[in-house]
């Protein structure tokens, strides 16, 4: 009889068993295309059992056979697997398995033995992956939208590194565009103001108060010499860029975010990377001179003048329009610079790239994917993760800011208000492309309304039980059938899902799934704690019953382990005591 095997990765083991049974029943090796579509996972509803698979649907399509008939054959084969209590078939061909309690008892023992390696599946096998995130223009401190992207990129990088990828965290510094000229002009006005002149911050300049300390530092270093200096622009540019990048690095450090590589647009220009990239694409026949149609939304002829220009064949790769690489004055477009930057990434050996962008760049995704495909002959991939805006509230009331007056909440403001760990966790409590409501009052509450508090409280409770427990029986001697109540089994089933959560979060580049999961674990543990508060028989530490106490405390150890592993991916320290 085939066994479900170790419960360290229960769903991974069942996947292997399903693949084995498919091969035995229908012969031949299971193809990669079939494997890619095969799902073996926990069902969304308890009534569908403990494990479900779409194998019959996938094989039915592949073999052109009735999936219900295939499901019945698969049901009979899986019913023979040790640890499987029952197998059901549900139209149009899903197969649902229910495991025996012995599987859950074994899980407690196996997970305790695995310790901190529990869930660390080696998906990446050392493969290089480049995660570019934040990449905010160096014109001011990080606002809260940047902070959301920073936390997302950092947590995703942690997750990918934990599952075996060689991760490079990269920041692209746009230090060669028109916004830098605007920065220089804005700083110069503040410089004159620091020297005692009356100035007016004109429309289109940066009005923020954060420029005043930079201007003051310029005065301390140069006095009034820059007023008449021919090198004024270059001096201010270098000084302002360094000052603001230092400010950005400090803000990211407050959030617990650090990059491995900073790549500068100006350096790529100096090394003529754009020209090399254009030549490369021309040799591949990916560029041509042509005329674009009038963009949608531009109705008047006077607002649009058709002209022949250098275009990238973006539509060959699924984009809705070919894209211009050169402006009328002969300079390169922003998109040309972006193509060149990804040309540089690929030349550095990155064929697996992830890019975090603000949601307002949604229309940019298809052209960027087209460029990466063209540059690599389809060998490189880029996953663009869009992060949506953050709405700030105070007890449900929106916090009003004015961009016109240079008023906005910075990453520093938020960390100083609620702390790094709280800020990081809240940023992960919604899928990255969904608008996030951040309520300062709720964030600081010590209640279930503060999700990170709720999780930390569960961990602290678990640690308290472990500290106060008597010496436990050796784990090999423990009878885990003593943790057989419905809430205990429900908690174990949830804890067994951890490797599956890790894998799905990593494969889909969606680390918010871990936040959702940790909340489920915390809730299930608090429910079990509540049963113990109401019934002596359900307490974790049972006076005079070391056998039951040992079984329950080993379960508590798994709760603490899983919460600490999840929080470590978020770079949040688990709390052993609540103060």
From Swiss-Prot:
GO molecular function: arginine-tRNA ligase activity; ATP binding
EC number: 6.1.1.19
UniProt KW keywords: Aminoacyl-tRNA synthetase, ATP-binding, Cytoplasm, Ligase, Nucleotide-binding, Protein biosynthesis
SMART domains: Arg_tRNA_synt_N, DALR_1
Cell compartments where the protein resides: Cytoplasm
Keyword Nucleotide-binding listed: yes
Catalytic activity: tRNA(Arg) + L-arginine + ATP = L-arginyl-tRNA(Arg) + AMP + diphosphate
Example GO BP: arginyl-tRNA aminoacylation
Record flagged with keyword rRNA-binding: no
Motif 'HIGH' region, residue numbers: 136-146
InterPro entries in the cross-refs: aa-tRNA-synth_I_CS, Arg-tRNA-ligase, Arg-tRNA-synth_N, Arg-tRNA-synth_N_sf, ArgRS_core, DALR_anticod-bd, Rossmann-like_a/b/a_fold, tRNAsynth_Ia_anticodon-bd
This protein's GO CC annotations: cytoplasm
PANTHER family noted in UniProt: ARGININE--TRNA LIGASE, CYTOPLASMIC, ARGINYL-TRNA SYNTHETASE
Membership in a protein family: Belongs to the class-I aminoacyl-tRNA synthetase family.
Oligomeric form and interacting partners: Monomer.
NCBIfam families: argS
Protein name: Arginine--tRNA ligase
Native organism: Anaplasma marginale (strain St. Maries)
Record lineage: Bacteria, Pseudomonadati, Pseudomonadota, Alphaproteobacteria, Rickettsiales
């Amino acid at each position: 009889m085939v066994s479900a095997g170790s419960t360290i990765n229960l769903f991974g083991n069942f996947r292997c068993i399903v693949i084995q049974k498919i091969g035995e029943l229908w012969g031949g090796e299971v193809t990669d295309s079939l494997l890619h579509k095969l799902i073996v996972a926990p069902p969304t509803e308890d009534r569908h059992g403990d494990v479900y698979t779409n194998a019959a649907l996938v094989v039915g399509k592949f073999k052109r056979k009735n999936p219900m008939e295939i499901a019945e054959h698969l049901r009979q084969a899986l019913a023979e697997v040790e640890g499987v209590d029952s197998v059901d078939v549900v139209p149009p061909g899903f197969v649902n398995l229910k495991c025996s309690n012995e599987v859950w008892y074994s899980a407690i023992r196996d997970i305790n033995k695995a310790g901190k390696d529990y869930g660390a599946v080696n998906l990446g096998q050392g493969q290089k992956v480049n995660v570019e995130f934040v990449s905010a223009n160096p014109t001011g401190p990080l606002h809260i939208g940047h902070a959301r992207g920073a936390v997302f990129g950092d947590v995703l990088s942690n997750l990918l590194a934990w599952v075996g990828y060689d991760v490079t965290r990269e920041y692209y510094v746009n230090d060669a565009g028109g916004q830098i000229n605007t920065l220089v002009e804005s700083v110069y006005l503040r410089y004159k103001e620091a020297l005692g002149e009356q100035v007016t911050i004109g429309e289109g300049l940066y009005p923020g108060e954060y420029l005043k300390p930079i201007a003051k530092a310029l005065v301390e270093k140069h006095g009034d010499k820059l007023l008449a200096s021919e090198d004024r622009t270059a001096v201010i540019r270098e000084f302002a860029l360094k000052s603001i990048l230092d400010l950005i690095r400090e803000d990211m450090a407050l959030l617990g975010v650090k990059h491995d590589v900073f790549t500068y647009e100006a350096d790529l220009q100096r090394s003529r990377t754009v020209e090399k990239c254009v030549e490369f694409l021309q040799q591949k026949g990916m560029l041509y001179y042509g005329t674009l149609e009038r963009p949608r939304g531009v109705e008047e002829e006077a607002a649009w003048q058709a002209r022949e220009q250098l275009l990238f064949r973006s539509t060959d790769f699924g984009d809705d329009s070919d894209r211009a690489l050169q402006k009328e004055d002969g300079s390169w477009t922003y998109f040309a610079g972006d193509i060149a930057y990804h040309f540089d990434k690929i030349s550095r050996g990155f064929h697996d790239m992830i890019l975090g962008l603000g949601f307002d760049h949604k229309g940019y995704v298809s052209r960027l994917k087209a460029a990466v495909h063209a540059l690599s002959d389809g060998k490189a991939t880029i996953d663009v993760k869009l992060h949506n805006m953050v709405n700030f509230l105070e007890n449900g009331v929106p916090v009003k800011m004015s961009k016109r007056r240079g008023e906005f909440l910075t990453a520093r403001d938020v960390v100083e208000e609620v702390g790094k760990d709280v800020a990081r966790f809240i940023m992960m409590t919604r899928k990255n492309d969904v608008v996030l409501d951040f309520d300062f009052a709720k964030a600081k509450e010590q209640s279930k309304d503060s999700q990170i508090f709720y999780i930390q409280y569960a961990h602290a409770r678990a640690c308290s039980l472990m500290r106060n427990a008597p010496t436990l029986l050796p784990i090999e001697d423990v009878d885990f059938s003593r943790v057989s109540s419905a809430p205990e089994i429900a908690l174990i089933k949830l804890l067994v899902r951890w490797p599956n959560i890790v894998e799905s979060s990593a494969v889909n580049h969606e680390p918010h799934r871990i936040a959702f999961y940790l909340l489920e674990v915390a809730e299930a543990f608090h429910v079990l704690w509540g049963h113990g508060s109401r019934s002596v028989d359900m307490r974790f530490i049972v006076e005079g019953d070391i056998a039951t106490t040992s079984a329950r405390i080993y379960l508590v150890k798994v709760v603490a382990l899983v919460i600490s592993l999840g929080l470590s991916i978020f770079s949040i320290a688990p709390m052993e005591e609540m103060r």
